């Protein structure tokens, strides 16, 4: 434990918290335009073709973001909304695209966890 004198000479320095999603700049979401829509493969031990998009945001950042759910209608120049949240097995992917917002449609025929995928409530049959 330091003495008062030592603390006067060199005060305690608090740790600087680094943002996990710097491109959002403390906003909950950001709008952007897709510059490239493609698939990529995850790290070992997983194997798949994950759908991702390179997005140029309104604040000038260019980020890679993940397109969740089965099937999508994104193309180059689609306007999308991105939120934070990384994909653990895709290095460099620190953002998710919000389904059912702007140009990206919700997941078709989704019955459970619909709010996460922008799916409307199915008509009662």
Curated annotation (Swiss-Prot):
InterPro entries: NA-bd_OB-fold (IPR012340), Ribosomal_uS12 (IPR006032), Ribosomal_uS12_bac (IPR005679). GO terms for biological process: translation. Belongs to the universal ribosomal protein uS12 family. GO terms for cellular component: small ribosomal subunit. Pfam families: Ribosom_S12_S23. CDD domains: Ribosomal_S12 (cd03368). This is Small ribosomal subunit protein uS12. It comes from Cupriavidus necator (strain ATCC 17699 / DSM 428 / KCTC 22496 / NCIMB 10442 / H16 / Stanier 337). The gene is rpsL. With S4 and S5 plays an important role in translational accuracy. Interacts with and stabilizes bases of the 16S rRNA that are involved in tRNA selection in the A site and with the mRNA backbone. Located at the interface of the 30S and 50S subunits, it traverses the body of the 30S subunit contacting proteins on the other side and probably holding the rRNA structure together. The combined cluster of proteins S8, S12 and S17 appears to hold together the shoulder and platform of the 30S subunit. Keywords: Methylation, Ribonucleoprotein, Ribosomal protein, RNA-binding, rRNA-binding, tRNA-binding. One of its GO terms (molecular function) is tRNA binding. Part of the 30S ribosomal subunit. Contacts proteins S8 and S17. May interact with IF1 in the 30S initiation complex.
């Amino acid at each position: 434990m330091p003495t008062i004198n030592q603390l006067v000479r060199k005060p305690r320095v608090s740790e600087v918290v680094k943002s996990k999603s710097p491109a959002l700049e403390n906003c909950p979401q950001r709008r952007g335009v897709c510059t490239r829509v493609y698939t990529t493969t995850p790290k070992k031990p997983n194997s798949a073709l994950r759908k991702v998009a390179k997005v140029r945001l309104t604040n000038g950042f260019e980020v890679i973001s993940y397109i969740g759910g089965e099937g999508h209608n994104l193309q180059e120049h689609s306007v999308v909304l991105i939120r934070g949240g990384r994909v653990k097995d895709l290095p460099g992917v620190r953002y998710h695209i919000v389904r059912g917002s702007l140009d990206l449609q919700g997941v078709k025929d989704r019955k459970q966890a619909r709010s996460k995928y922008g799916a409307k409530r199915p008509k009662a049959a």
